[in-house]
């Protein structure tokens, strides 16, 4: 990968900073997202469910010919890399995430051209009003504790005529591996099954609710919402189980009830029952939302 991933970020007032790997990282007071999750997320979940939708979002952003793009909830950089591949060098890309450990993983992988990585809280973006042409968020809105407030922040930093583009997952029934993982965990922990998947990543799919939150965030134009179906493939039934359980906050839910190994094996068994031992192929579905300021 290109060495262009190393560059200077000037810390904002009221933040702490440290120098590491040629980058000045902005730090908030939030607890760092640590441990093995970022690596597992990148190794298993990115190719399993995120790459196809990252390419889709990047195409939608590029079609608008933006000069400056803000990515929120960048994670380990799958959309960042897709944007870097399709946007001209003159287009500035600022990729942010709440968790520095995820951004460190993104920076370690690198991009094909210059990108600015910066820790930022979507609830209070550290950018001036009207400073970006496009704000893009891949599978992050579901995690915002106050969605209208976060969406209002995206509107604030958008220039007039700019666009917010984000995607969210469809329901569990339309995301077959995730549904199998949920069923496997319910069998393993019948008295108190982990509900993270259906509660958060796969719990924000209703179009009317999404449109209402966008409007509550101050957007006057109606939100355009389209459904995009893709396929999810892995070499073995164990790969989706590892990805969903050990590469997401679901890991903590499982650990609170028993061992991660027990949960992962139960999910693997359920995926095997439904799809065979591997290679496995399942349906995934997302909704893509576009709204202009």
Give short role names for the model-derived ranges:
Residues 68-125, 149:
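Class I SAM-dependent methyltransferase SAM/SAH-binding core
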Residues 30, 38, 76-78, 201-293:
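Conserved Class I S-adenosyl-L-methionine
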Residues 123-134:
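A short acidic, Gly/Pro-enriched loop at the edge of an enzyme's catalytic core
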Residues 14-39:
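N-terminal, positively charged/glycine-rich alpha-helical extensions of SAM-dependent methyltransferases
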Residues 47-67, 82:
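Conserved alpha-helix/loop element of class I SAM-dependent methyltransferases that forms part
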Residues 133-148, 170:
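A short SAM/SAH-binding and catalytic strip from SAM-dependent methyltransferases
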Residues 148-149, 155-235, 251:
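Conserved catalytic/acceptor-binding region of the Class I
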């Amino acid at each position: 990968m290109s060495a262009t991933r190393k560059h200077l970020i000037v810390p904002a007032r009221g933040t702490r900073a440290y120098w590491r790997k040629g980058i000045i990282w902005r730090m908030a007071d939030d607890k760092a997202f640590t441990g093995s999750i970022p690596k597992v997320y990148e190794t298993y979940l990115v190719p399993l469910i995120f790459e196809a939708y990252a390419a889709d979002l990047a195409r939608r952003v590029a079609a608008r010919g933006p000069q400056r793009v803000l990515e929120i909830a960048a994670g380990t950089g799958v959309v960042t890399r897709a944007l870097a591949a399709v946007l001209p060098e003159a287009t500035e890309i600022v990729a942010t995430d709440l968790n520095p450990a995820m951004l460190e993983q993104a920076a370690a992988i690198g991009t094909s051209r210059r990108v600015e990585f910066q820790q930022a809280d979507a609830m209070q973006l550290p950018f001036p009003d009207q400073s970006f042409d496009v704000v893009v968020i891949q599978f992050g809105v579901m995690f915002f504790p106050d969605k209208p407030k976060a969406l209002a922040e995206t509107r604030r930093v958008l220039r007039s005529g700019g666009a917010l583009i984000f995607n969210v997952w469809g329901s569990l029934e339309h995301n077959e591996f995730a549904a199998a993982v949920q069923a496997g965990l319910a069998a393993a922990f019948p008295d108190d099954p982990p509900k993270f998947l259906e509660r958060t990543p796969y719990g924000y799919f209703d179009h009317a609710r999404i449109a209402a939150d966008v409007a509550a965030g101050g957007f006057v134009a109606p939100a355009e919402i389209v459904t995009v179906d893709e396929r999810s493939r892995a070499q073995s039934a164990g790969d989706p189980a590892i990805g969903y359980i050990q590469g997401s906050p679901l890991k903590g839910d499982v650990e609170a009830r028993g061992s991660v190994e027990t949960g992962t094996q139960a999910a693997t068994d359920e995926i095997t029952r439904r799809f065979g031992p591997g290679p496995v192929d399942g349906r995934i579905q997302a909704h893509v939302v576009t709204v202009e300021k």
